[in-house]
Design a protein with these regions (language model features):
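PP2C/PPM-type serine/threonine phosphatase catalytic domain
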Residues: 1-245
Length: 245
């Protein structure tokens, strides 16, 4: 598989606190992609997201093997998220100006014809199919809980006053629990990882249409960014697209 990514500060923020990376794994053709959306005063959100990305990747490279089973890969990803959490928390403890900083994380590690997906917070993973965009991850957020309890709709969640409140993040707590998913990909299916800066400005249907307008993966990402900016882009926008060559 191959991948490309895009990140932008948006139209209403002064600093981009999102970080993404794509690197090769241990197996032939294996890719690792990760997106983090940081939070914290001054530039601490950017520090949190970049620290988490680097720690997650470094730890994963140290344990990845080409012959890993899916279950072993799931365990490795969870372990590396805990290490990334410790790195962010340690920095906050050592630098008082960064107290309380944190970051979301969503990652994909390709594994043969599929991928192992992991998330903490409200950065998302989607499967881009032939007819629609299928959300893989569940947000760890206040509004997600309200949707699941039937108190609000998904459309209402996009403008809810508490839409930015997440219930899990790397950094604030000693221990973190991540959700891990196994995904099988068809020959024409792609994976989209993104920060909530994209999600709050467009519906899944609109995002699917924007991706479909691109003749290349890079153009698809440009269309997603353009869509977000047309809606005011109130937050940083980051997206990574993984696709078959």
């Amino acid at each position: 598989m191959k991948a490309c990514g895009i990140t932008d500060v948006g139209l209403q923020r002064h600093e981009n606190q999102d970080t993404f990376a794509v690197e090769r794994g241990a197996a032939d053709g294996q890719l690792i992609a990760v997106v983090c959306d940081g939070m914290g005063g001054e530039n601490c959100g950017q520090i949190a997201s970049s620290l988490a990305v680097r720690a997650f990747l470094d730890e994963l490279h140290a344990v990845l093997r080409a012959d890993m089973t899916t279950e072993q890969l799931r365990e490795a990803v969870s372990f590396c998220v805990s290490k990334a959490n410790a790195a962010v928390k340690r920095h906050a403890q050592e630098h008082t100006e960064c107290h309380g900083m944190g970051t979301t994380l969503v990652s994909a590690v390709t594994n043969g014809s599929g991928a192992v997906i992991c998330n903490v917070g409200d950065s998302r993973a989607y499967r881009v199919g032939a007819e629609r965009l299928e959300r893989i991850t569940r947000d760890h957020s206040v509004v997600e809980g309200l949707i699941e309890s039937g108190n609000i709709t998904a459309e209402q969640a996009r403008t809810h006053p508490n839409r930015n409140l997440i219930t899990r993040a790397l950094g604030p707590e000693e221990h973190i629990e991540c959700d891990v998913y196994d995904v099988t990909l068809g020959a024409d299916e792609r994976l989209l990882l993104c920060s909530d800066g994209l999600v709050v400005t467009a519906t899944d249907e609109e995002m699917y249409e924007a991706v479909g307008r691109g003749d290349t993966p890079e153009e698809s990402l440009e269309h997603l960014l353009e869509l977000s900016k047309q809606r005011g882009a109130p937050d940083n926008v980051t997206a990574v697209l993984l696709y078959h060559e």
